Structure formats: structure tokens, C-alpha cells
Amino acid sequence: MSKRGRGGSSGNKFRMSLGLPVGAVVNCADNTGAKNLYVISSGVRGRLNRLPAAAVGDMVMATVKKGKPDLRKKVMPAVIVRQRKPWRRKDGVFMYFEDNAGVIVNPKGEMNPSAITGPIGKECADLWPRIASAANAIV
């Protein structure tokens, strides 16, 4: 694995449908005090003129659009834990959630908050063990 890659993640991630392009506003699923996160960049850049997009388990750079004033107007990393866009798992099941959500992390992928509201995707739990330990349901 290269030196510059996923901070606290372990293992590989299969190809999945990218459901959250740059400019997407997602719910914040942790107890930091942020309500909405605005995705400003993603690691994946695809075809010419296509917006970079992210999926469950991807780390993105985001800002807080609604929430505590001390969290707003700062760029911070976040990990996507739920997406509405259906994706296909290796066992043939098509999976999707009822909302788009992410959690705020530090650059290494460790969480400061202690709780995550709602379920998280198995792809995210496999890659980010600190997020998986704080989740109450892994789907």
C-alpha cells in the first residue's frame, strides 16, 4: 500500500456505484453537533468533466453547513456511511439506505464522537474499525 492513501482503513474496497458527487449535502450521523455536511472534494476523479464522487466507505473532505458555530467554516475529513444510490454487493444483493450520511473523522480515520445514529454499511465497517465500534447497527 502506498504511503499516501487511506489513513486508518485496513483492506481493500470493491468497486461500487458512486452516489455522492462533489457538492452533495449529506446528514451528519455522529454526535459532534453538526447537522449537515457539504462534500467539497473526493479522492476519485473519473472521466473528463465528470464530477468526482464518493460511495460508502470513502473518505471525503467536507464542511459543516448546519450545526455548531465552532464546527462551521472549517474543512475537515469525513467518511461516508450511508448512500441512497443502490449498489451491488458481491453476493448479488442490491443495497441502499434511505438517506445520505457521513461522520466527521480526523485525517487518520479516528472518530472523536462516541456515537453514530442509524445503521452503517458493511463496506464502511470493514474499512474503518473505529467507526464500526461506534456504530449500533451494521447492515
From Swiss-Prot:
InterPro entries on file: Ribosomal_uL14 (IPR000218), Ribosomal_uL14_CS (IPR019972), Ribosomal_uL14_sf (IPR036853)
GO annotation, cellular component aspect: cytosolic large ribosomal subunit
Any one GO BP annotation for this protein: translation
Alphabetical UniProt keywords: Ribonucleoprotein, Ribosomal protein
Gene3D superfamilies in the record: Ribosomal protein L14
Keyword Ribonucleoprotein in record: yes
Matching CDD domains: Ribosomal_uL14 (cd00337)
A Pfam cross-reference name: Ribosomal_L14
GO MF terms, alphabetically ordered: large ribosomal subunit rRNA binding; structural constituent of ribosome
Family: Belongs to the universal ribosomal protein uL14 family.
Protein name: Large ribosomal subunit protein uL14
Source organism of this protein record: Syntrichia ruralis (Great hairy screw-moss)
Highest classification ranks of the organism: Eukaryota, Viridiplantae, Streptophyta, Embryophyta, Bryophyta
